[in-house]
Amino acid sequence: MANKPFFRRRKVCPFSGDNAPAIDYKDTRLLQRYISERGKIVPSRITAVSAKKQRELAAAIKRARFLALLPYAVK
């Protein structure tokens, strides 16, 4: 009996949909989830964020860093 091929479920963007949170540079708790423990922005292939929302997220993180709401690097 042949085994069925493994089906990887497609990830859904956490920022698209009705109840999705808005990307805001002042919401540091939300932005913190998309930053690694070293302070780098986590890529979208890991977080499943769409390309458009990843650009918005990166801009919000960079703005929050500039305003000293988030650190540039963690030691």
Curated annotation (Swiss-Prot):
Q: Which PANTHER family match?
A: 30S RIBOSOMAL PROTEIN S18 (PTHR13479), SMALL RIBOSOMAL SUBUNIT PROTEIN BS18M (PTHR13479:SF40)
The entry sums up its family as follows: Belongs to the bacterial ribosomal protein bS18 family.
Q: Which molecular function terms from Gene Ontology are attached?
A: small ribosomal subunit rRNA binding; structural constituent of ribosome
Is rRNA-binding a UniProt keyword of this protein? yes
- What's the protein here called? Small ribosomal subunit protein bS18
Say which domain of life the source belongs to.
Answer: Bacteria
Q: Which gene encodes it?
A: rpsR
Keywords assigned by UniProt? Ribonucleoprotein, Ribosomal protein, RNA-binding, rRNA-binding
Q: Name one GO cellular component term.
A: cytosolic small ribosomal subunit
Tell me the PROSITE patterns matching this sequence. RIBOSOMAL_S18
| Entry-linked Gene3D superfamilies | Ribosomal protein S18 (4.10.640.10)
Summary of subunit composition and partner proteins: Part of the 30S ribosomal subunit. Forms a tight heterodimer with protein bS6.
**GO terms under biological process:** translation
Cross-referenced InterPro entries: Ribosomal_bS18 (IPR001648), Ribosomal_bS18_CS (IPR018275), Ribosomal_bS18_sf (IPR036870)
Q: What does this protein do?
A: Binds as a heterodimer with protein bS6 to the central domain of the 16S rRNA, where it helps stabilize the platform of the 30S subunit.
